[in-house]
């Protein structure tokens, strides 16, 4: 898929998420690089946030880009913000090549922040049943772009 098209689609997805969060009283912030995301003020969100994780291979701290980090108005039991990745695909071939990326991201997040860490995919386009089954087996939830209100069940 053309990266320019994918970037445009991600921008549209993030705009849908911003509108949804703004309507629920959330405030967008740009977080300082040194701020631990667990210390985000409740009711805030940040787009294109680098989240520090420990690299499983090197043991070194590295930054993982996350499309949207949301600190719910009421803290969740895991005391972590909700991490959302915007994903779009035009065909099944593209999704099958990339499906392990999200699982690897979640594994690094869980190695750093604990087994209860969650990653939510915000999907638009073609995602076949095999892709969705794979992500579910890895413990990754998803919400379709046209059903943004389903994020309510994630604690937003």
Q: Which functions belong to the PLM regions below?
A:
Residues 25-35:
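Short, well-structured beta-strand/strand-turn elements
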Residues 35-156:
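Catalytic core segments in nucleotide and nucleic-acid processing enzymes
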């Amino acid at each position: 898929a053309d990266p320019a098209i994918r970037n445009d689609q991600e921008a549209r997805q993030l705009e849908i998420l911003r509108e949804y969060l703004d309507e629920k009283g959330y405030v967008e912030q740009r977080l300082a690089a040194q701020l631990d995301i667990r210390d985000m003020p409740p009711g805030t969100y940040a787009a294109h946030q680098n989240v520090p994780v420990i690299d499983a291979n090197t043991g070194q701290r590295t930054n993982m880009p996350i499309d949207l980090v949301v600190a719910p108005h009421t803290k969740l039991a895991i005391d972590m913000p909700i991490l959302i990745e915007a994903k779009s695909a035009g065909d099944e071939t593209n999704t099958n090549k990339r499906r392990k990326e999200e699982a690897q991201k979640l594994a690094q997040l869980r190695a750093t922040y604990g087994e209860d860490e969650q990653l939510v995919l915000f999907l638009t386009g073609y995602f076949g049943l095999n892709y969705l089954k794979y992500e579910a087996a890895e413990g990754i939830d998803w919400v379709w772009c046209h059903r943004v209100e389903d994020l309510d069940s994630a604690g937003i």
